[in-house]
């Protein structure tokens, strides 16, 4: 169940309730956001599976840039203790034909040593989608160029695990054919130490396990 409310100028309140079959695993949360002339603010809290979590964030424009900071602090109901936080600090350059974005992510669920990646994969919080990263410290970036005709778009995105080190690059080219049809071609290229399987399976880096691939896609919108 989801309820959205707009109690006043610039305010938005978003509440969600998820019934997972038992009161023990019941999940619910509420988030309030406020748009001000100088910043967008949000804060909230709730229960997610067996954690109680508080969160807050702010984004503010600085010239042609936008600075973002958000974080979440979980409390484990079973261990009766706080877990490490999850924090993201980012900067975006918007406007014109070029868009740039970069961010640092502190992943409290992640490991500081590749030897512990298997443990992260077995963590229920990873299985529940609370994080998609195995490492503790990560960098992400994106650069996009769209010429004035808006029919062509070139994008390069990347992720970097600062501890392995390992990473990925994702170049993409999109052409707007017209008539609500788009054609895209791109690749996913990873680098880092590859896993070993003998005598025991072991991950030596995060993104080195991903492999590489090339893709093409035709999208039609109705």
Regions inferred by a protein language model and the residue ranges of each:
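Outer-membrane beta-barrel "beta-signal"
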Residues: 143, 206-222
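Residues that define the transmembrane beta-barrel architecture of outer-membrane proteins
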Residues: 1, 24-28, 35-37, 49-54, ...
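Residue-level signature of outer-membrane beta-barrel architecture
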Residues: 5-7, 33-36, 47, 59-60, ...
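Outer-membrane beta-barrel translocator domains and adjoining extracellular loop/strand segments
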Residues: 25-30, 54-56, 79-85, 112-119, ...
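Detector for outer-membrane/organellar transmembrane beta-barrel domains
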Residues: 59-159
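Repeated loop/turn-to-beta-strand initiation elements of outer-membrane beta-barrel proteins
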Residues: 9-13, 38-43, 64-68, 97-101, ...
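Outer-membrane beta-barrel domain signature
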Residues: 18-21, 42-46, 55, 76-80, ...
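Sequence/structural signature of outer-membrane beta-barrel proteins
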Residues: 10, 18-23, 39, 48-53, ...
């Amino acid at each position: 169940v989801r309820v959205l409310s707009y109690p006043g100028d610039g305010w938005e309140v978003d509440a969600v309730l998820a019934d997972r079959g038992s009161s023990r695993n019941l999940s619910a949360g509420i988030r309030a956001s406020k748009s001000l002339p100088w910043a967008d603010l949000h804060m909230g809290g709730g229960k997610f599976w067996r954690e109680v979590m508080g969160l807050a964030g702010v984004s503010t424009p600085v010239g042609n840039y936008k600075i973002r900071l958000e974080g979440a602090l979980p409390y484990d109901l079973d261990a009766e203790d706080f877990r490490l936080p999850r924090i993201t600090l980012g900067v975006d350059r918007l406007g014109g034909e070029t868009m740039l974005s970069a961010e640092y992510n502190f992943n409290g669920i992640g490991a500081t040593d590749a030897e512990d990646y298997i443990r992260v994969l077995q963590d229920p919080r990873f299985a529940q989608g609370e994080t998609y990263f195995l490492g503790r410290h990560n960098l992400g970036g994106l650069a996009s160029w769209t010429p004035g005709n808006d029919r062509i778009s070139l994008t390069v995105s990347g992720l970097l695990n600062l501890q392995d080190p390992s990473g990925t690059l994702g170049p993409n080219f999109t052409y707007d054919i017209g008539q609500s049809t788009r054609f895209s071609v791109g690749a996913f290229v990873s680098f880092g130490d590859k896993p070993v399987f003998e005598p025991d399976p072991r991950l030596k880096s995060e993104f080195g396990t991903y492999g590489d691939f090339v893709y093409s896609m035709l999208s039609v919108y109705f």
